[in-house]
Design a protein with these regions (language model features):
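Conserved structural elements of the adenylate-forming
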Residues: 1-8
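Active-site glycine/GP-rich loop and adjacent strand/helix microenvironment
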Residues: 11-300
Length: 301
């Protein structure tokens, strides 16, 4: 993924990415199976833990902070590491825009304590995860009063407009998903970004990748995704009404209302079309069949 972005943004191999990544709690199903989100599965797998070195994909967050099961400790440690390595950060982000904004809000509430950590080279006592403490302590290194003063000056300003650019001045873009339901967060991201481009690189779910944005520097309103037909078998269910109206109909599914039932019956009776028969300018609901034979209705495109 990072290789194709290198075509549009120079020098990504000359620094690090401050990507805020988290694991989620696992649950045990009635059958005794472990269920967890796909990203949690990936971060806990050997593919992530033992990934080969890639100069385009170096994180400021140690793996120990990403794999911390306590979300507050994980967030704190990842942001602290990102601040300490601010001069090396070339890109920042999270999976979703909402998650990245939660991190900014968390920083607003905790920057003073982080400055104290940097000034004294001591991790806060409430960080009790031993792996996190050890990993962050190594990154903190020696006391750094100059860095703590700089962060205090920027974060203590009356307005946080452009704070991302101020704290991480070499940042070339913010990588978060800002399409679909995440589009509502674009104005807030632009307020904090200081003019840094918002990059939405992919379209995916737990089942598979759907598409990639091959023009990553396009405006959020102009983002489009190129479908990856090798990831799953895609079919397209034509939607007669506009996107907003259809979304409302889907939300009322399962409610014992006759109009909803009629709309659902009508939807199930429609025929899907293959990719080659999709018409430009029309709306479709994506129907995905995975390699395991599981299929599901996803959402509109």
């Amino acid at each position: 993924m990072c290789i194709y972005k290198f075509r549009y943004v120079d020098g990504l191999d000359q620094g690090k990415g401050m990507y805020l990544l988290f694991i989620k709690p696992e649950i045990i199903t009635p059958a005794g199976l472990t269920a967890r989100p796909v990203l949690t599965s990936y971060y806990k797998s050997g593919n992530f833990r033992n990934r080969p070195f890639n100069r385009f994909n170096i994180y400021t967050s140690p793996d120990e902070t990403i794999l911390c099961s306590d979300s507050k400790q994980s967030m704190y440690c990842q942001l602290l590491c990102g601040l300490v390595q601010r001069d090396e950060v070339l890109r920042v982000g999270a999976v979703f825009a909402s998650a990245f904004l939660r991190a900014i809000k968390f920083l607003e509430e905790n920057w003073r304590e982080m400055c104290s950590n940097i000034r004294t080279s001591h991790v806060s006592d409430w960080i009790t995860d031993p792996s996190c403490r050890n990993a962050v302590s190594l990154i903190l290194g020696k006391p750094n009063s100059d860095l703590a003063d700089l962060i205090e000056y920027e974060c203590g300003s009356k307005s946080w407009e452009g704070i991302i650019k101020k704290l991480w001045p070499r940042t070339k873009y913010i990588e978060v998903i800002v399409t679909g339901s995440m589009a509502q967060y674009i104005p807030t991201l632009e307020f904090y970004s200081g003019g840094i481009p918002l990059v939405s690189t992919m379209y995916a779910s737990s089942e598979c990748y759907f598409g990639i944005n091959f023009k990553p520097l396009s405006k959020p309103s102009d983002v489009s995704y190129t479908l990856l037909p090798n990831m799953a078998y895609f079919e397209f269910l034509p939607v007669e009404k506009n996107h907003e109206e259809m979304s409302e109909e889907i939300q009322c599914n399962g409610v014992s209302d006759q109009n909803c039932i009629q709309e659902e019956d009508k939807r199930e009776g429609m025929q899907t079309v293959d990719l080659v028969d999709v018409k430009l300018g029309h709306y479709y609901e994506l129907v995905v069949t995975t390699s395991t034979g599981i299929f599901f209705f996803f959402l509109q495109i």
